[in-house]
């Protein structure tokens, strides 16, 4: 994982990008609205789960994050940031069943306007709040891969063709 504060061009240069490996990634540029700034709140967040590693990034605001965080902490969860994004990771870790079902059960507990991207070893999951208040668009890359973004201009910059909005 590589992350830092500042503009993308300040955090990543060609050398750092060359060192990255794999066929999937989460990128995130944060405008601090909840949880404050600082390196501890820079996304994506990485979680170790019984199923392996899980990365999460999100755009939006979880309005019941404080009450969920309090409940999770009372049950043993340890938070490493003040970001509301981290709440979803802890909720998913507490659920049982198939991974996709754990995500769905966790999202049912969250109130607010949001779009999430969740990356695990063999899959990428995306989700929006039940009212679709936060944008999330899907694009197809020239290589045949896919990307998701909260702004279609990011698809254009990456050379991806807009496919549709996530519902």
Regions found by a protein language model. Name each.
Residues 1-166:
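Conserved short alpha-helical segments that host acidic/polar catalytic motifs at enzyme active sites
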């Amino acid at each position: 994982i590589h992350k830092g504060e500042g503009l993308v061009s300040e955090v990543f240069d060609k050398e750092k990008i060359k060192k990255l490996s794999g066929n999937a990634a989460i990128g995130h540029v944060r405008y601090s609205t909840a949880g404050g700034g600082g390196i501890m709140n820079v996304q994506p967040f990485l979680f170790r789960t019984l199923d392996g590693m899980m990365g999460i990034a999100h755009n939006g605001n979880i309005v019941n994050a404080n009450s969920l965080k309090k409940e999770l902490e009372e049950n043993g969860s340890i938070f490493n940031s003040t970001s509301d994004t981290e709440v979803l990771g802890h909720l998913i870790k507490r659920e049982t069943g198939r991974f996709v079902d754990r995500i769905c059960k966790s999202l049912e507990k969250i109130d607010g306007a949001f779009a999430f991207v969740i990356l695990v070893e063999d899959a990428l999951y995306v989700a929006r709040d039940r009212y679709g208040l936060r944008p999330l668009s899907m694009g197809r890359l020239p290589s045949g891969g896919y990307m998701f973004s909260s702004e279609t201009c990011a698809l254009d910059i990456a050379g991806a063709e807009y496919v549709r909005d996530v519902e």
